[in-house]
Amino acid sequence: MKRPTRFFGLHAHSGFSTFDGLGYPQEHINFCLDNGLDGWALTDHGHMNGFAHAYLHAEKLRKAGANLKFIPGCEMYVHPDLELWQAQYEIKKAAKKGDKSAIKAIIDAHEHLRTKLVAIVDGDDETVNLDTEGANLTIENEEETKSSKFYDPIKRRHHLVVLPKTSEGLRRLFGLVSQGYMDGFYRFPRVDYKMIKEAAKGGHLMISTACIGGPLAYEAFSRLQGYEFDRLTPELLNDKSIFEAVQSGVGNTIDQLVDAV
C-alpha cells in the first residue's frame, strides 16, 4: 500500500472520554507531531472538556513554528427524535403502573407519532426498570452502543462525530453540546437530528458516522439480534435476505443523516 503524503485524524478520544480514551490532549498532539500527521481532531464523548487543553497547547506549538492543525469536535450521543423518545418514556412509566388510560392519552397527544408509539406499546422490547437502570451513568457503555445483543428504545442512542468548519460552526457546536445536557439528558447528554439540522444551517458543521456505535451500524445490529460482531460480515455475504434487510435500514438512516446536514 502506498504511504499517504498527508494524514489528518478526525476521530480521537483523550482521557476526558472516561473508559474510552487515554492521555491528555497535549500528549495526543505531541504524538501527531512526532509521527508526521498534518492535523488532529479531538472528539471526546458528549462534551468538549478537553478543548482548552488542546487549543492552548496547539497554539503554543504553532507560535514555535509547528505545522499542525487542530480541530475541536465532539462525538455526540444522538437519538433520531427526542420528542418520540419522551413519549416512549412516558408510556413505559404508565405501562409499569398498568395505566392503560394514561398510555392512550399519551398516544392521542402525539398524533403525528401514533404509528411508532403503538409499535412500542405492542412490541416485545425490553421493559426498563426505571428505578434501577442507572440514571446517573455518564460514562461510555459499549455493551449498549456496540452490540447486536442490546436493543431498548428507551436507552437508545447513537454516536455521531460533529466538527466545526468555521468559527461560527464552533460556536454552534458549543451550543449543541450544551443543548444535549439541558434538553436531552437521560443518562447521557443527547441531541437529535432536528437539533443537528438547525445547528448545521449554512454549512458550518461537518458530520461523520463515527464508529460501530453509529446509526448505520445500529441499523445492521438491530436486524441481526444475537450476532457477535465478528460474524456480521460473513453472514451478510452468505445470506442475501439478511443483506437486503440491513441495506434497507441503512438506506433509511443515510437519508435521515443527509437531511439533517
Predicted features and spans:
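Phosphodiester-processing cores and adjacent nucleic acid-binding clamps
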Residues: 1-261
